[in-house]
From Swiss-Prot:
Keywords associated with the record: Cell inner membrane, Cell membrane, Glycosyltransferase, Membrane, Transferase, Transmembrane, Transmembrane helix
Transmembrane annotation, as ranges: 140-160, 194-214, 513-533, 568-588, 615-635, 656-676, 680-700
Function recorded in the entry: Involved in the biosynthesis of osmoregulated periplasmic glucans (OPGs).
Localisation per UniProt entry: Cell inner membrane
Gene symbol of the encoding locus: mdoH
This protein's name: Glucans biosynthesis glucosyltransferase H
GO cellular component terms given for this protein: plasma membrane
Chief localisation class: membrane
KW Transmembrane helix (keyword) present: yes
InterPro entries: Glucans_biosynth_gluTrFase_H, Glyco_trans_2-like, Glycosyltr_2/OpgH_subfam, Nucleotide-diphossugar_trans
Pfam family, one: Glycos_transf_2
Lineage, broadest ranks: Bacteria, Pseudomonadati, Pseudomonadota, Gammaproteobacteria, Enterobacterales
Length: 842
């Protein structure tokens, strides 16, 4: 069999069609497949003429009549997106300087948006009612939190050993030995720092406690007159004039999982009978060429399997401007005006058709709602770490989400996915300008979701959490280290967002959201400083003689005092604030039926194990978050390159590499405290033991085998595992099917395989006009690539080749026409582990 017959045999044709092709040359084969009988000046451009035929034979059920068109140079192009109808989406520059804002106000340039003019009188009254209620509730929350913090801080002050602040007079220290003055002041300086940090941290814990408590009461009562879900009956027909786009921004994601979840979601939408009201947009920012080809293949298969022609679209951006938020902005500018609403999905999102339809109904029933956020439930993971986190979010999460809604009402959070957005005000008000200045906290906004919610509210639109709406799902990171990688990005984003705290027009609730976002990570170094100062105070007490006389002619000494009964009482009170939300959560589960969680005994045991697990992980997260915050402020880049692994487990070597410093710190801390005062080590035991065990906990909890064993024992069981909804069962089934036909080494297949080459050529985005300079550049790219071995061709160069239909055509032609000349490429392709199911296109 010669190279021509080998090529013909690789074509997606029937035996009769193959036998009818000429076997004289590759050019003749492509000319025979070209129904338009195009002529090309170069022989190696002839595959451009056969692209349409190769695509039509490979994916006949995926193409509609008007998708394959000719570009300006007569090359076949696959239109994977509808015709654009552009809108203007221009960001307003940020004024983060309060002095500048004050000057604008003096000159009459500080104009507050007059949003109420678009509402009817009845809508204004309803709007004003819930906003007044929300304001009153938040003042109550502030009063409760501050009162609790003041009392606890006063108790903390009485517990601390050195009580002689009032006797210290700086004037008496003039002329005194500096060392003596320093030793007199040191304990009190340490105590002052401890007291300030305690007040801040206790206030943070108190706010979480009251949020969970109100969420518990809300869920226990079961009635919420201000719940946005109560604004519809739930079976109203959707308005055909208001169409919705389901948009999924992705970037180098697990292609099999992305398209499995998307297919399950779309089929659930079709089952409701409302598919005509929705379109799907897969918005790819992927820059891994292998993944890009796999995405194109998966999109073609998805369209064929769900009959999604004209409703499921795919786009890969050539210029990745502003990451995810820029991807969404690009969609809004090009196609947003064609839709009333859009639902943003993450790569791991799965939503039922009924949930999506309900979100649309809520938008139509609440004309002043700008964003409605569903409450995603975590499911689908098997590692011990992920199952424990799934259980925690499933049991505790509803309390905190309902509590957030209770305090915030329509001035709430948006988490960036599984939410519906009103497109027109989003385009008008939510474009994100880069933060001004230079440095680590300038440039493109990373955590865009909080900022978009704040801008939507600033324009007068409501931002709601539909906390009681079922059918919204997501997945969690499989292990601790993957979660910390995500936290590294979120930490940087939240610290950047705090620069917007004083921006004009931001609602106080969203200023508080920026503050809580910062505190989510800043609390870690504050806690670490609190522990460090407490340790330092103990060192001072153990190694130095107390200063009993702080004033000249002082008659009575100031004795250090210890009040263990108050210390125990304060410790117990703090533990109540920390752990009572967990107890309330389990009480709610007991009241509503623990069967779906494994029964009364197992859900209680799971709770106790989760508490132990969270105690072990809290100090570990504290140290990592402290490093993240410090590195962000100092402008350090935390490089985190994990080794490739076949599953989600953390290798022992990586665990000790990441946690080795924590283990060492825990050992030194424990030994030092045991030497100084064994009693103080008792109080530090939860911290130091967690640090010493951190590599072991991190590695063992990442094992799916351990997680599946707990699943068999019905520990950490959640309702989605006890009785999986159909959309999750479909996701698992489609994921299994996609894994079986998964395409690896997509770029090499796009070079060699006739079907995938046709697909890559038709979907290539660099549609340049012919030009002499461009022709020289193309020839240089192709020649340099073929004269090297494929493994020396880096990712960026592969992406350049993949983006140009002409270079892909020439690569394809040359490796087939002269296999002996380009033997390094041919041998590399033949050595690949080929998946026959992945290459089966018909």
């Amino acid at each position: 069999m010669n190279k021509i017959t080998k090529y013909i045999d690789a074509l997606p044709l029937s035996d009769a069609e193959k036998s009818a092709l000429p076997d004289t040359s590759l050019q003749a084969v492509h000319q025979a497949l070209d129904d338009d009988h195009q002529t090309f000046a170069r022989e190696d451009d002839s595959p451009l003429g056969s692209v349409k035929a190769r695509l039509a034979h490979s994916w006949p059920d995926s193409l509609s009549g008007d998708q394959l068109v000719k570009d300006d140079e007569g090359r076949t192009q696959l239109h994977a997106m509808p015709k654009a109808k552009r809108s203007s989406m221009i960001p307003d520059p940020w004024r983060t300087n309060p002095v500048g804002r004050f000057w604008d106000r003096l000159r009459g340039r500080d104009v507050t948006p007059r949003y109420l003019s678009r509402l009817t009188q009845e809508e204004r009254e309803s709007e004003q009612k819930w906003r007044t209620v929300g304001t009153i509730r938040r003042y109550i929350l502030l009063l409760l939190t501050l009162s609790q913090t003041v009392v606890a801080t006063w108790y903390m002050k009485t517990i601390l050993p050195y009580q002689g602040w009032a006797l210290i007079n700086p004037a008496d220290m003039v002329g005194q030995n500096l060392w003596i003055s320093f030793m007199q002041l040191l304990p009190y300086v340490l105590q002052s720092g401890i007291l300030i940090l305690f007040a801040v941290l206790f206030c943070w814990v108190s706010a979480g406690f009251w949020t969970a408590l109100m969420g518990f009461l809300q869920l226990l009562i079961g009635r919420d007159k201000y719940s946005i879900s109560a604004s519809t009956v739930g079976d109203e027909p959707l308005n055909p004039a208001h169409r919705t786009a389901l948009i999924m921004p992705i970037c180098n994601e697990d292609v099999d999982r992305v398209f499995a979840g998307l297919r399950a979601t779309w089929e659930s939408v079709k089952a409701t009978g409302n598919a005509a009201h929705f379109d799907v947009y897969i918005l790819s920012d992927s820059y891994n060429p292998d993944i890009c080809v796999a995405e194109q293949k998966a999109w073609m298969e998805l369209i064929a399997e769900v009959q999604g022609e004209g409703q499921i679209f795919y786009r890969r951006r050539r210029r990745r401007v502003k990451r995810k938020s820029g991807n969404i902005d690009d969609f809004c500018r090009r196609w947003g005006s064609q839709y009333s609403y859009m639902v943003v999905l993450d790569a791991d999102s799965v939503m039922t058709g009924e949930c999506l339809s309900s979100l649309v109904r809520l938008m139509e029933a609440n004309p002043n709602a700008g964003i409605i956020q569903s409450s995603p439930r975590a499911s689908g993971m098997d590692t011990l770490y992920a199952r424990c986190q799934q259980f925690a979010t499933r049991v505790y999460g509803p309390l905190f989400t309902a509590g957030l809604h209770f305090w915030q009402l329509g001035e709430s959070h948006y988490w960036g996915h599984n939410a519906i957005i009103r497109v027109k005000p989003f385009i008008e008000h939510c474009a994100l300008a880069p933060l001004p200045g230079e440095g680590n906290f300038a440039g493109s906004i990373l955590s865009h979701d909080f900022v978009e919610a704040a801008l939507m509210r600033r324009a007068g639109w409501g931002v709601w959490i539909a906390y009681d709406l079922p059918g919204s799902y997501e997945e969690l990171p499989p292990n601790l280290l993957d979660e910390l990688k995500r936290d590294r990005r979120w930490c940087q984003g939240n610290l950047m967002n705090f620069r917007l705290f004083l921006v004009r027009g931001m609602h106080p609730v969203h200023r508080a959201v920026f503050l809580t976002g910062v505190m989510s990570y800043l609390s870690a170094p504050l806690w670490f400083m609190f522990l460090a100062l407490s340790t330092a105070l103990q060192v001072v007490h153990a190694l130095t003689e107390p200063q009993y006389f702080l004033q000249p002619r002082q008659l009575f000494p100031v004795w250090p005092q210890w009040r263990p009964e108050l210390a125990i009482a304060l410790f117990a009170s703090t533990m109540v604030l920390l752990f009572l939300p967990k107890l309330l959560s389990i009480i709610l589960v007991w009241c509503k039926g623990p069967k779906e969680y494994g029964g009364f005994f197992r859900v209680t045991l799971s709770l106790l194990l989760e508490v132990l697990f969270s105690v072990l992980l809290a100090p570990v997260r504290m140290l990592f978050h402290t490093v993240f915050v410090v590195s962000a402020f100092l402008g350090w880049e935390v490089v985190w390159n994990s080794p490739q692994r076949d599953d989600d487990s953390t290798p022992w070597g990586e665990a000790f590499m990441r946690h080795g410093s924590q283990l060492l710190l825990g050992l030194v801390w424990a030994v030092g405290m045991a030497w100084l005062d064994l009693r103080f080590l008792f109080w530090l035991a939860p911290i130091v033991v967690s640090l010493i065990l951190s590599p072991f906990v991190s590695a063992i909890s990442s094992r799916a085998t351990v997680g599946l064993r707990t699943k068999r024992w019905k520990l950490f069981l959640i309702p989605e595992e006890y009785s999986p909804p159909q959309v999750l069962k479909d996701t698992d089934a489609y994921l299994t099917m996609n894994r079986q036909r998964s395409l690896d080494d997509g770029f090499m297949h796009a070079v060699f395989n006739p079907s995938f080459n046709a697909l890559a050529t038709a979907m290539a985005t660099a549609r340049h006009r012919q030009g002499h300079i461009l022709e020289i550049a193309r020839e240089r790219h192709v020649e340099q690539a073929l004269n090297e071995t494929p493994d020396k061709l880096n990712r960026d160069r592969r992406l350049v080749l993949l983006s140009d239909p002409v270079t892909m055509s020439r690569l394809h032609y040359r490796v087939w026409a002269a296999p002996e000349k380009y033997s390094s490429w041919v041998n590399a392709y033949q050595q690949l582990a080929l998946n026959p199911l992945a290459l089966k296109t018909k």
